Amino acid sequence: NVVALCADLIGSLKMDQFIKENPERFFQIGIAEANMMGIAAGLTIGGKIPFAGTFAEFATARVYDQIRQSIAYSNKNVKIAASHAGLTLGEDGATHQTLEDIGLMKMLPGMVVINPCDYNQTKAATIAAAEYEGPVYLRFGRPAVPVFTPADQKFEIGKGILMNEGTDVTIVATGHLVWESLVAAAELEK
């Protein structure tokens, strides 16, 4: 029942393999993010589990009304896959950057926000999101980060993971910045 929708970013979102293997489960919406959210909400009525993919800025601020009205308030089983989050799209300028997306999405009723830190956690989080009944905002950064979580790690929605133990400083991070926090912790240990 999983289907994918894209707002004209197949290459940037690395959707080629899914489309090749499942062309009948893919919908190219074009540069029409607001329509994509409405279509995704509608697909849930027929039992589909839509993953709507675009850049984080376009998946939140640009379409907030549609998400609020058509997805969150009605508790639709839509998964919003938002890539290139934060300042990771520097070369594309401020119009493509978002820092407020987590806050915007956390304010919505019933919306679950997931911000995985590496490939293994992203894979596990995506599976957990698909299995979860209700709206989910999956947030991904753009930078390549090393794979540092176990491949068999179970992802639990709403639960943090202790990556390192120490006695002097607590560092809290989310998403692709978890790797940077581990690097910083190693430096502080010296």
PLM segments and residue spans:
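Glycine-/acidic-rich phosphate or pyrophosphate-binding loops and their flanking alpha/beta elements
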Residues: 1, 19, 124-135, 144-187
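Flexible, glycine/charged-enriched surface loops at secondary-structure junctions
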Residues: 190
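Thiamine diphosphate
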Residues: 1-139, 144, 154
